[in-house]
Design a protein with these regions (language model features):
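Catalytic cores of the polymerase beta-like nucleotidyltransferase superfamily
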Residues: 1-259
Length: 259
């Protein structure tokens, strides 16, 4: 059904994204988003299609999705509709693009960071071709707004798999939103107080602070603030490192420079 047909079927609706085919149907105090099957036109900026076309064909809608685990549907008559192996990838805990990974990332560069975020939240692995496509297309992330990148990064670092942020370094993606992280991972800490390099130490700090925040019942806003503090608390160490005559590393004034 197209948005006009959906609105005609229900007494109370809200046009939450009607230009993209989305109408919120209100039943009592609860809202349910109903989105018409869509086909995307040509993408012009590695982010947005020039036009969105409605279609009655579910297959056309599913093939425009980003990852196989997001390209399944359910019909009460036929059950799960799974044209791209999403169910198998769920069972194997794999993030895989629908169709050609390079094409999916050419269409929308944010999908690269979303894939890593899903890997963290679900504690899945990136399928090899998806990983390699992110590596190739990483420079196109410059077409994505800082706000959208921040949203994905925030969801990643407060997740159970926050250490999947390493995938952003391994693919070269972090160079376009957090270039300091690669330097942190390359900075060793030769002193009695640390057993990790700066980067792995910071990732471990995020993991611990997430666990503590969950145990303490912190609100999401508080957990986000603490996760970013853990991520960035040693961000200036690579530029402040000094090694004394005994081979001990010092990072004088790194908190001030980091702030």
């Amino acid at each position: 059904a197209n948005p006009i047909q959906v609105k005609a079927l229900f007494r109370r609706t809200i046009d939450t994204g009607i230009q993209h085919g989305t109408v919120t149907v209100m039943i009592g105090d609860d809202g349910y988003e109903v989105t018409t099957y869509r086909m995307d036109g040509e993408y012009e900026d590695h982010r947005h299609p020039k036009e969105v076309l409605f279609t009655p064909n579910l297959n056309e809608d599913l093939k425009r999705r980003d990852f196989t685990i997001n390209a399944m549907a359910y019909n009460p008559r036929v059950g799960i509709v799974d044209l791209y192996g999403g169910r198998e990838d769920l069972e194997k805990k794999v993030i895989r693009c629908v169709g050609e990974a390079n094409e999916r990332f050419d269409e929308d560069a944010l999908r690269m960071l979303r894939g890593i975020r899903f890997a963290g939240q679900l504690q899945f692995e990136l399928e090899e071709k998806t990983f390699l496509a992110i590596k190739e297309k990483a420079p196109t992330l410059v077409n994505v707004s800082a706000e959208r990148i921040r949203t994905e990064l925030t969801k990643l670092i407060v997740s159970k798999g926050s250490d999947k942020l390493l995938l952003a370094v391994e693919t070269g993606l972090s160079a376009y939103f957090l270039p300091e992280l690669e330097k942190m991972l390359a900075t060793t800490q030769e002193n009695p107080h640390h057993c990790f390099d700066v980067g792995h130490h910071s990732l471990a700090a995020i993991s611990h602070i997430n666990d503590l925040g969950e145990q303490a019942g912190f609100r999401t806003k508080e957990r986000v603030m603490l996760a970013y503090a853990a991520l960035l608390h040693d961000v200036a160490k690579p530029d402040c490192k000094q090694v004394d005559d005994e081979g001990i590393a010092h990072f004088y004034k790194h908190p001030e420079y980091g702030a």
